[in-house]
């Protein structure tokens, strides 16, 4: 299992700093992750409420997650001109890229907004109800994300500006972060993020397998918006065979109706022309 885990995540990023516990969901399995663990596409991280974890990428980009943050490496591009994507479901995060390759960009998805950045440094606080982003330096593009995953008009923000999106309201752009944002921000976010990757070039750690994911482990992700939870049905379908996982899926089906076809496949079977129930095939209750 350890060999499979490391092969899964060869090039995307490395955990270079860990304070407190870090849970890693890879595939449908939960691991404990430590400094030196390599990360790959699809990896989901949950950070200790009192801790932090820093990910450094091969192109020099750095992402620090703090105070219970939950994030997923959705797609990490390998080429210099590619666009990498990271979902931050909740909590605090600071990202920076001092010298991005020509055309290289990172897109950060939150439940309420999307930010695309090249050479920029920013701090964000994300939750289901709101997203706040302080652009420390550089420039970014941002847009609102609706409950159904629809992207709004793309707007620009530059160093010093503060983006706030609450609920379904239109995002506001202010000249400085709010006092409350600064007060609640993790203290180490006031400083530049340290560059630690070179120290770990010859160090490789393997995540420790804990257990197959429970519904509680992934509940918040399964209930996220369409732009964040795509591919989750295929990824976690194997866990629907577990009786408790299945029970919770059914109990919360309204929050993730895309699971209906997995849970009740008979509703979607094609009926023969002589089947008295053929007129009801494919209906969804």
PLM regions and their residue ranges:
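Flexible, surface-exposed loop/linker segments and immediately adjacent secondary-structure boundaries
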Residues: 9-261, 265, 269
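Extended, charge-rich intrinsically disordered regulatory tails
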Residues: 276-281
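Charge-dense, extended regions
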Residues: 283-285
């Amino acid at each position: 299992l350890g060999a499979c885990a490391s092969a899964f995540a060869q090039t995307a990023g490395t955990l270079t700093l860990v304070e407190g516990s870090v849970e890693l969901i890879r595939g449908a399995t939960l691991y404990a992750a430590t400094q030196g663990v390599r990360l790959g596409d699809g990896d989901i991280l949950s950070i200790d409420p009192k801790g932090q974890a820093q990910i450094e990428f091969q192109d020099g980009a750095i992402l620090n997650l703090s105070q219970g943050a939950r994030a997923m490496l959705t797609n990490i591009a390998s080429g210099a001109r590619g666009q990498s994507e990271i979902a931050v479901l909740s909590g605090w995060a600071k990202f920076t890229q001092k010298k991005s390759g020509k055309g290289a960009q990172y897109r950060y998805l939150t439940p309420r907004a999307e930010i695309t950045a090249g050479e920029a440094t920013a701090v964000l606080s994300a939750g289901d109800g709101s997203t706040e982003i302080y652009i420390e330096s550089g420039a970014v593009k941002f847009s609102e994300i609706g409950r159904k995953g629809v992207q709004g008009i793309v707007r620009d923000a530059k160093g010093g500006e503060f983006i706030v999106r609450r609920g379904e309201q239109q995002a506001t752009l202010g000249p400085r972060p709010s006092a409350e944002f600064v007060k609640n921000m993790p203290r180490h976010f006031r400083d530049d993020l340290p560059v630690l990757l070179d120290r770990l070039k010859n160090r490789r750690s393997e995540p420790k397998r804990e257990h197959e994911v429970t519904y509680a482990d992934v509940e918040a992700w399964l209930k996220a918006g369409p732009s964040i939870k795509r591919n989750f049905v295929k990824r976690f379908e194997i866990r629907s065979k577990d009786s408790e996982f299945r029970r919770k899926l059914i109990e919360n089906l309204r929050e993730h109706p895309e699971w209906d076809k997995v849970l009740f496949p008979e509703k979607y079977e094609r009926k023969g022309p002589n089947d008295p129930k053929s007129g009801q095939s494919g209906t969804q209750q």
